[in-house]
Amino acid sequence: MGQCCTGGGKAVAGDEAEPGTSKAAPPSRGTSSKNGSAKQQPCSPAAKAAATEAAAAASSSKKPAGPIGEVLERPMEEVRTTYSIGKELGRGQFGVTHLCTHKATGEKLACKTIAKRKLANKEDVDDVRREVQIMHHLSGQPNIVDLRGAYEDKHNVHLVMELCAGGELFDRIIARGHYTERAAAALLRAIVGIVHTCHSMGVIHRDLKPENFLLLSKGDDAPLKATDFGLSVFFKEGEVFRDIVGSAYYIAPEVLKRKYGPEADIWSIGVMLYIFLAGVPPFWAESENAIFTAILRGQIDLASEPWPKISSGAKDLVRKMLNINPKERLTAFQVLNHPWIKEDGDAPDVPLDNVVLNRLKQFRAMNQFKKAALRIIAGCLSEEEIKGLKEMFKNIDKDNSGTITLEELKNGLAKQGTKFSDNEIEQLMEAADADGNGIIDYEEFVTATVHMNKMDREEHLYTAFQYFDKDNSGYITKEELEQALKEQGLYDANEIKDVITDADSNNDGRIDYSEFVAMMRKGSGCAEATNPKKKRRDLVL
């Protein structure tokens, strides 16, 4: 939504760690004293975050403690006791974000509300709990969104955090109208500094992209804030993660191979640097699978326009950040010490070709269109549909083992009358079977089939198309797109022409249904085609 320091709904990221390692226990980087003793004991970031939460809960109210909440595992408390809730800022299937005001101070903040009924299993609950722990752990860092409080009542979990009124990172680039390598270096320096902080505190973000960096205000000197820690995890040095999470253009090759660590964040920032300098992603294709294939090849184009005009220092840094071998890739600290990125470094203060700025405008505009469409699709997924998938699993799992094989899945889906092709079922099994043992369990099945059977189905794409096609003419016109984006709070008059131009393959000045579907499926913004544990907070924009 680009207006508050929050990514919206809750993300799912389960079974990330290599067997035998701690899923949410980072390296012991801090100390704590026991009963005032001078003796220091190791304290992990997760433990410190939990302690911070407990302290916040203990000091937030003088009233008698309420019943313990099953999500945050501390006394439940009404968020409206402290904050007044204002206008809606964004909505999706799994939650809604409102403007809120602190009653005592008048401070304007953002309140993200997650409906507890949407937390379908223990993994979902653990993910919300971990997101809160990580945000508490990172609290106080100047360029990371500040979580002011986490509240739980009978029906919801509420996360109150800073309001970022300055828009997205792309907004700053585009608004200035001119752009230099030195400006790109300054942006990258801020971003890498944030990631260096996260890594030094034992946190991998796992979803770094321009949309997750917001400006605190509209001022020229407004600080950049990293947001959306819904996919983030605590890590220990040497720990290996296996979940495929992130956004398609920015996913590192080792993530696709299900064996990665903090180096994956550096790859994502390298992709961002490429986009800052060229205006397009380095790995571009007509479908997610083709994008992933290109990523795995790791061949980057530094010869086409505008690269001949880009400095050798910038190209050197791009190569070193997009090294396909994570062991040879630069660390955040090494990036910050590269000659091109330093404050008085080698990045020239010469305007980049206008084509770069125009490409950035078009790239951002299409993201906004897709955001609006995904929001409509999210509304198509009812709680009843999800419950139906749970019942489907029970019927397929005849021996009540809690797992099903590929053949059981094929037979069970056929008996259920669900129209999956063999290829879809095989993709489903491959994506969901994280440990490669040939079976999927209940939670994997539900999260995977929600995507395969709901998110990308024709009827939901058509529903989204109809939302934009206000007069039911079979076409989305410039005026209809303007109206729809205004309704979604994503409107920018300067971007509408770029959106139409990019999607309108037959150049008739409007978007028909086939062009709309092609646009939605071309280089989709999230890794759902391969990731059964879909990024739920992408649907709350």
Curated annotation (Swiss-Prot):
**What are the recorded Gene Ontology BP terms?**
intracellular signal transduction
Task: Quote the catalytic activity from the record.
Answer: L-seryl-[protein] + ATP = O-phospho-L-seryl-[protein] + ADP + H(+); L-threonyl-[protein] + ATP = O-phospho-L-threonyl-[protein] + ADP + H(+)
The topology of this chain with respect to the membrane is:
Lipid-anchor
Q: Which GO terms describe its cellular component?
A: cytoplasm; membrane; nucleus
According to its UniProt entry, this protein's organism is Oryza sativa subsp. japonica
Q: Does the keyword Repeat apply?
A: yes
Q: What is known of its domains?
A: There are 3 contiguous domains conserved in the CDPK subfamily: a kinase domain, an autoinhibitory (junction) domain and a calmodulin-like domain. The autoinhibitory domain (347-377) inactivates kinase activity under calcium-free conditions.
Return the protein name. Answer: Calcium-dependent protein kinase 25
* Gene3D superfamilies, sorted: EF-hand, Phosphorylase Kinase, domain 1, Transferase(Phosphotransferase) domain 1
Its chief place of residence is membrane
Q: Where is the composition biased (Gly residues)?
A: 1-11
Q: What family does this belong to?
A: Belongs to the protein kinase superfamily. Ser/Thr protein kinase family. CDPK subfamily.
Function, as annotated, reads: May play a role in signal transduction pathways that involve calcium as a second messenger.
User: Which molecular function GO terms apply here?
Assistant: ATP binding; calcium ion binding; calcium-dependent protein serine/threonine kinase activity; calcium/calmodulin-dependent protein kinase activity; calmodulin binding; protein serine kinase activity
